[in-house]
Amino acid sequence: MRHRHGLRKLNRTSSHRLAMLRNMSNSLFQHELIKTTLPKAKELRKVVEPLITLAKKDTVANRRLAFARLRDRDMVTKLFTELGPRYNARPGGYTRILKFGFRQGDNAPMALVELVDRPEITEAPAEEAAE
């Protein structure tokens, strides 16, 4: 019986793992779609989903807790002004993990991690330029 299951080790030291998940969280909040390996994606979900739940209630204490995890003022602002209100009615499940084949060099399983209900980007300007 393993009490209090933690995060996977991912063959990294604890400081490297913390920094990697912090950088991946910031990238996901910035771009709302990232490509990574499947085990990293599953661990990233455990970090990102509680942060979005925290952002639903905009208080100084919650902003400080989010800043302690992200260490990026711009991402904390985006989290509380855009993402928190966007997912206010959703009770969880803010991320989607899609399997994306295997990496060329080492055959590692890859995945796309995206935030659900993200705005779709239209390619209309490219069509006008082609004409």
Swiss-Prot record:
Subunit structure: Part of the 50S ribosomal subunit. Contacts protein L32.
Keywords: Ribonucleoprotein, Ribosomal protein
HAMAP family, alphabetized: Ribosomal_bL17
Domain of life: Bacteria
GO-annotated cellular components: cytosolic large ribosomal subunit
InterPro entries (alphabetical): Ribosomal_bL17 (IPR000456), Ribosomal_bL17_CS (IPR047859), Ribosomal_bL17_sf (IPR036373)
SUPFAM superfamilies (UniProt xref): Prokaryotic ribosomal protein L17
Record-linked Gene3D superfamilies: Ribosomal protein L17
Taxon lineage: Bacteria, Pseudomonadati, Pseudomonadota, Betaproteobacteria, Burkholderiales
Coiled coil residues, start to end: none
Family label: Belongs to the bacterial ribosomal protein bL17 family.
Protein's recorded name: Large ribosomal subunit protein bL17
Gene: rplQ
Pfam families (alphabetical): Ribosomal_L17 (PF01196)
BP GO annotations: translation
GO molecular function, one term: structural constituent of ribosome
